[in-house]
């Protein structure tokens, strides 16, 4: 560029890698953790935790913040080509190990670890893997029998005292009762008998009341049925009286124009009693029948026809 190029002044700071904050012990977080019992190089959480076996040196190091600039999910790793990595490092590490005086068994163990890591990386890139962190093991609680053996030793089997009513063989004995106890028993028996008699009387009275109420209801129902029957009979008599009339046979002579009227005996045919809305229609039909059966009206009609 020469002398005509723009000049840029760059100043190298005292902490180019920005690691002074991690080494400082004057921060608030460092001081509060120390106050809570944490020591530098220790792990956070309970010391006797169930997952304490899984702690490594990374658990005591600082938290690394990684910028997420892709649309992958949390914890996802992009696929990497295994051929992009450096080749020949395994052989070079083995050569360095031999120069340092390591035995063949140690070299084989290290090589086996490297091969296992390669296989794990290949499987992780080819198939999705899920990493599980154990939260502890289920441990059976101690039973009361094993927890407190001393309490069982303290238990003493006391002999059960036989009552006066129970004999040595387990049979009950009948003791002679005193006169006072006999009188008390008689009084209680009499009271019980009196209560039973009162209950029986109450039950009898209740039954008699029920029977009387039933009889009164039955009588009322019978009276109502009788009234209905009487009213039905009256209506039927009136209808039959109106309906029973002489059957007229009308014969019209075509030549003379005279009519012959003949009457027969009373009709004994029974008709069904109309119900509901058909009552009015039946009345109208009966009026028409009466008009046809009337002698005078028929004669007038036939005279008009003859003229």
Swiss-Prot record:
Biased composition (Basic residues): 1-11
Biased composition (Polar residues): 15-25
Highest taxon above the source species: Eukaryota
Predominant location: nucleus
GO annotation terms (biological process): rRNA processing
Residue span, G-patch domain: 25-79
Molecular function terms, GO-annotated: nucleic acid binding
Keyword Cell membrane: no
Renumbered residue ranges of the record's region Disordered: 1-25, 144-234
Compartments reported by the entry: Nucleus, Nucleolus
Biased composition (Basic and acidic residues): 154-168, 206-221
Annotated keywords: Nucleus, Ribosome biogenesis, rRNA processing
Function: Involved in rRNA-processing at A0, A1 and A2 sites and negatively regulates telomerase.
Family: Belongs to the PINX1 family.
Protein name per Swiss-Prot or TrEMBL: Protein pxr1
Organism: Neosartorya fischeri (strain ATCC 1020 / DSM 3700 / CBS 544.65 / FGSC A1164 / JCM 1740 / NRRL 181 / WB 181) (Aspergillus fischerianus)
């Amino acid at each position: 560029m020469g002398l005509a190029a723009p000049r840029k002044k760059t100043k190298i700071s005292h902490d180019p890698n920005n690691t002074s904050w991690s080494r400082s012990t004057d921060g608030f977080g460092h001081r509060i953790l120390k106050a809570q019992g944490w020591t530098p190089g220790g792990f956070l959480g309970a010391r006797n935790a169930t997952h304490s076996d899984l702690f490594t040196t990374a658990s005591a190091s600082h938290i690394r913040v990684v910028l997420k600039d892709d649309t992958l999910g949390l914890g996802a790793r992009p696929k990497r080509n295994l051929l992009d990595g450096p080749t020949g490092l395994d052989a070079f590490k083995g050569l360095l190990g031999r120069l340092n005086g390591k035995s063949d068994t140690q070299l084989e163990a290290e090589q086996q670890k490297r091969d296992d890591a390669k296989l794990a990386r290949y499987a992780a890139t080819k198939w999705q893997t899920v990493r599980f962190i154990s939260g502890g093991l289920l441990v059976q609680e101690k039973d009361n029998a094993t927890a407190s053996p001393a309490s069982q030793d303290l238990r003493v089997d006391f002999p059960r005292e036989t009552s006066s009513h129970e004999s040595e063989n387990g049979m009950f004995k009948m003791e002679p009762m005193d006169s006072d106890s006999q009188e008390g028993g008689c009084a209680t028996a009499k009271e019980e008998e009196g209560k039973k008699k009162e209950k029986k009387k109450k039950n009898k009275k209740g039954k008699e009341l029920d029977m009387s109420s039933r009889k009164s209801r039955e009588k009322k129902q019978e009276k109502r049925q009788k009234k209905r029957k009487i009213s039905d009979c009256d209506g039927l008599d009136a209808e039959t009286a109106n309906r029973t009339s002489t059957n007229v046979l009308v014969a019209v002579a075509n030549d003379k124009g005279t009519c012959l009227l003949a009457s027969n005996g009373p009709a004994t045919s029974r008709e069904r009693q109309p119900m509901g809305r058909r009552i009015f229609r039946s009345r109208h039909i009966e009026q028409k029948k009466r008009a046809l059966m009337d002698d005078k009206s028929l004669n007038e009609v036939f005279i008009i026809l003859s003229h």
